[in-house]
């Protein structure tokens, strides 16, 4: 799952201290604690079992960054709350579900002077960076039109998603739930917002 996988990645970043973990499901926090232990790192404070346990994590004084990898409908509210409590935030895609939520994140970031970053990994994968380099080197000539999409088949993971939230979005959008996965690399090739 996304959260414990992220914890494993963070253990490899020199100077990073993972001081608190939170998940609605206690067993996921325990899995992340095991990852810390196997990496030779100290246990982190644990928050779980309550819908609002994450707020207690955000209210701590010893946290600089809150990494948000929850169900999507909570991303924006969690990001806003964390920034309002003095934390920078890194939010898995999508960072928000509506334009109003996007503006809430932007306005809160500007008001609090805290960074808010949507974590869009697909613009940095091997294929995407190779294609971008080829476009920048002129291999394709002048690029005038680009299309992108991202279909994510999650059948093998259906039982792992709490309350089936992820599958509901996949069914509603036919699996193409990350516009940024397909369009982010396309925007890079076209030099949009660079």
Positions of PLM-derived features:
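Predominantly a Rossmann-like dinucleotide-binding segment in NAD(P)-dependent oxidoreductases
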Residues: 2-3, 112-117, 122-194
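Short, well-ordered alpha-helical microsegments
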Residues: 29, 75-76, 98, 127-128, ...
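Short glycine-enriched loops at secondary-structure junctions
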Residues: 72, 95-96, 149-154
